[in-house]
Amino acid sequence: MTSPWPEPEIGRWLTLAPREPGQPPLACWLALPPQAPPRAGILVLPEIFGVNAWLRSVATRLALAGYAALAVPLFSRTAPGLELGYDDAAVREGRFHKERTSAADLLADLALAADGLAQALPDLPAGVGCVGFCFGGHVAMLAASLPQVRASCDFYGAGVATGRPGGGPPTLEGLAASPGRLLCVCGSEDALIPPEDVAAIAAALQAANRDR
């Protein structure tokens, strides 16, 4: 069946070698502008469905807009190479792997991805952006704490006000100490982000002088 998200020939798989004990290789998808040097690098973080055709299409669109876009897997420790669809079984499988992540492991992988992108493209401006969706949006908020990440965009990142991957204080509580810029986009009818969570996110962003 033809994919609803066709991929122009501007992307390729890029595997980053681990640099910490227990860290797996990261099989990322790199999309580059076809006609000019990239203006900046962006990490693209998936929902619970892995680096699938849709996420690769997001990287492609960013590349066509002039960016070096690196789609980064979030479940490399439990499901390397995961690509899921969107049926109920896929949701169950994706949630299974999500519950086995930790903030420390995710941040280590994102730091590796940011540094790997800089090494692959040494002429890029210093620092990267980060964009993530749903669970990837939650992780994009975490990524704002990394020195390599200049700006993050969290699209409907659920659970930031009440939890943190692997346990610990809610991710939102660390926002004030994060050096990177952050934009959060929440849907008014998103059942996974109730109004009280949206209010908490808005208050934290305002207190930290961030966007919302």
Where are these regions (language model features)?
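N-terminal cap/leader regions of alpha/beta-hydrolase-fold enzymes
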Residues: M1-R212
